[in-house]
């Protein structure tokens, strides 16, 4: 699996070959540093750990400082592991090597975007699951417009089944959006523009895979 770590900058609009407007997300990706290389002999599988976004040394715990010193790099805020990275890239990866955006992606191909969705706090079933509420707004209905309705049967089975959609904490979850096209790639500025929206707020971390 090939990928890179980046940040969401915002959204814009581009036009495709047919002249249709396409809502797009602007992402800054990399450069990332190889902070660890895993192999079958020692770890049981092959993978590459990439680090992104510099962090102050005084805010880094000593075990992690040793981890970064082995790679001869500055502390990083975000660490992500990609399996079979070197094999798919087609060349040997070295510890401390810098991975650029144009090393992984080309304009026109499709990628997957992973991010942390915006947290909404405790929400009801209408906002959380798209419920329509109970009944109409006449005929004596009272405070039922956004109610969940029945959540189970009576004496049989005498319980509420797992997975019942109810009110609760909404958002703040890892979300993956697949098959987003790279509309534009600006390698000198480490920026790419992909079609559609990606999860998370501005300046949130985004993992791009292909």
UniProtKB/Swiss-Prot annotation:
Source organism phylogeny: Bacteria, Pseudomonadati, Bacteroidota, Cytophagia, Cytophagales
Keywords linked to the UniProt accession: Ribonucleoprotein, Ribosomal protein, RNA-binding, rRNA-binding
Protein's UniProt name: Large ribosomal subunit protein uL3
Function in brief: One of the primary rRNA binding proteins, it binds directly near the 3'-end of the 23S rRNA, where it nucleates assembly of the 50S subunit.
Residues annotated as transmembrane: none
GO molecular function: rRNA binding; structural constituent of ribosome
GO biological process: translation
Entry's family note: Belongs to the universal ribosomal protein uL3 family.
One Pfam short name: Ribosomal_L3
Taxonomy, superkingdom: Bacteria
Cited SUPFAM superfamilies: Translation proteins (SSF50447)
Gene that produces this protein: rplC
A single Gene Ontology CC term: cytosolic large ribosomal subunit
UniProt subunit comment: Part of the 50S ribosomal subunit. Forms a cluster with proteins L14 and L19.
């Amino acid at each position: 699996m090939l990928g890179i770590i980046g940040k969401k900058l915002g959204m814009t609009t581009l036009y495709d070959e047919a002249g249709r407007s396409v809502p797009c997300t602007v992402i800054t990706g990399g450069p990332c540093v190889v902070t660890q290389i895993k192999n079958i002999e020692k770890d049981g599988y092959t993978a590459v750990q990439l680090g992104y976004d510099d962090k102050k040394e005084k805010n880094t715990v000593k075990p992690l400082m040793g981890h970064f010193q082995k790679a001869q790099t500055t502390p990083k805020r975000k660490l992500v592991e990609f399996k079979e990275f070197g094999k798919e890239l087609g060349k040997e990866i070295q510890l401390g090597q810098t991975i650029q955006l144009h090393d992984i992606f080309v304009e026109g191909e499709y990628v997957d975007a992973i991010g942390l969705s915006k947290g909404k706090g405790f929400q009801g079933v209408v906002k959380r699951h798209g419920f329509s509420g109970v009944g109409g707004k006449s005929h004596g209905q009272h405070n039922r417009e956004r109610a969940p309705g029945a959540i189970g049967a009576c004496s049989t089975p005498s319980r509420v089944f797992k997975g019942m959609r109810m009110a609760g904490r909404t958002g703040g979850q890892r979300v993956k959006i697949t098959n987003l096209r790279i509309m534009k790639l600006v390698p000198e500025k480490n920026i790419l523009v992909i079609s559609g929206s990606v999860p998370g707020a501005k300046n949130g971390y985004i993992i791009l895979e292909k």
